[in-house]
């Protein structure tokens, strides 16, 4: 089939590579978000998908909005059979959805109808899901509500960050998306409506959402830290400045600390929660590089009974 691929971040690149490598499909063009400022100099930088497409000699379309007439005219001119999508980053209007003969097919990183929305992997980790996965589905005007073509499952490991899990799903999902394109072309794959039961939502995790509440149980603190790593980054406040929490682990035999209370030993630093303590393994003070929690604690000389939090 003739395809127009839509995607933007690094997580979409494995799927694009899988479709480029396919001997059954032609990636005629790529749609991605416009170049965005990055780095200290705030220089405009092309998206990872745009860079990969340019390396492969594929036409790149960067509409400010996917309803722009110039973009729609070019899309109609290309006349794709199908438009596979991975983390494009903009809602597609009906006028765009109607262009490809076989629609737009999204690779979504959850087992739909669970975790519909922008941050399914982060929410799966934060909720303590033991299994998640990826789904390919036909995009409709609703939020991730279209009929499903295929799914795969992936174990959520006890130490997974959302970044770890998303990386595995990106590579596994690339094969699922390519197989979905094959099945659509063959006419052997038919989308099945999502059940009405089991719908959960996964809105974008904000910086405010990522603030650790020390009154929560240790298990919840651990999940928030892992779910918000690498982005937006779990955090707390120490002496009026933000402290990023990169890695923490529950310590089941410490129940002597009040929520937010710090306790430093020679090679460890602990903080109390609503249940057990957690050990801060890696942190990043404001304006500094990541460091081991014990090294940070030695440097700041924690006072007896000193607290983390607002």
UniProtKB/Swiss-Prot annotation:
Taxonomic lineage: Bacteria, Bacillati, Actinomycetota, Actinomycetes, Kitasatosporales
Catalytic reactions of this protein: L-methionyl-tRNA(fMet) + (6R)-10-formyltetrahydrofolate = N-formyl-L-methionyl-tRNA(fMet) + (6S)-5,6,7,8-tetrahydrofolate + H(+)
EC assignment: 2.1.2.9
SUPFAM superfamilies noted in UniProt: FMT C-terminal domain-like, Formyltransferase
Main function: Attaches a formyl group to the free amino group of methionyl-tRNA(fMet). The formyl group appears to play a dual role in the initiator identity of N-formylmethionyl-tRNA by promoting its recognition by IF2 and preventing the misappropriation of this tRNA by the elongation apparatus.
Gene3D superfamilies documented for this protein: 3.40.50.12230
Stored CDD domains: FMT_core_Met-tRNA-FMT_N, Met_tRNA_FMT_C
Protein name per Swiss-Prot or TrEMBL: Methionyl-tRNA formyltransferase
Keyword vocabulary terms for this entry: Protein biosynthesis, Transferase
């Amino acid at each position: 089939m003739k395809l127009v691929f839509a995607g933007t971040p690094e997580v979409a690149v494995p799927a694009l590579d899988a479709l480029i490598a396919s001997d059954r499909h032609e990636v005629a063009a790529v749609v991605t978000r416009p170049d965005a400022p990055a780095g200290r100099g705030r220089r405009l930088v092309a998206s990872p998908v745009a860079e990969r497409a340019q390396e492969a000699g594929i036409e790149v379309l960067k509409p400010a909005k996917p309803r722009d007439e110039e973009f729609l005219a070019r899309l109609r001119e290309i006349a794709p059979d199908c438009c596979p999508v991975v983390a494009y980053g903009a809602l597609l209007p009906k006028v765009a959805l109607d262009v490809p003969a076989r629609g737009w097919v999204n690779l979504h990183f959850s087992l739909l109808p669970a975790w519909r929305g922008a941050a399914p992997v982060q929410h799966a980790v934060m909720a303590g899901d033991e299994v998640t996965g990826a789904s390919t589905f036909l995009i409709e005007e609703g939020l991730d509500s279209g009929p499903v073509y295929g799914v795969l499952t992936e174990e959520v490991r006890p130490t997974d960050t959302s970044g770890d899990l998303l990386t595995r799903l990106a590579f596994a999902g690339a094969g699922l998306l390519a197989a979905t394109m094959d099945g659509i072309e063959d006419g052997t794959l038919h989308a099945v409506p999502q059940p009405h039961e089991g719908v959960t939502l996964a809105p974008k995790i904000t910086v405010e959402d990522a603030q650790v509440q020390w009154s929560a149980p240790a298990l919840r603190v651990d999940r928030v830290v892992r779910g918000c790593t690498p982005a937006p980054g779990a955090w707390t406040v120490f002496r009026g400045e933000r402290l990023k929490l990169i890695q923490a682990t529950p310590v089941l035999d410490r129940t002597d600390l009040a929520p937010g209370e710090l306790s430093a030993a020679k090679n460890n630093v602990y903080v109390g929660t609503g249940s057990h303590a957690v050990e801060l393994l890696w942190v990043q003070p404001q304006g500094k590089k990541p460091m081991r929690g014990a090294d940070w604690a030695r440097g700041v000389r924690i006072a007896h009974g000193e607290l983390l939090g607002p």
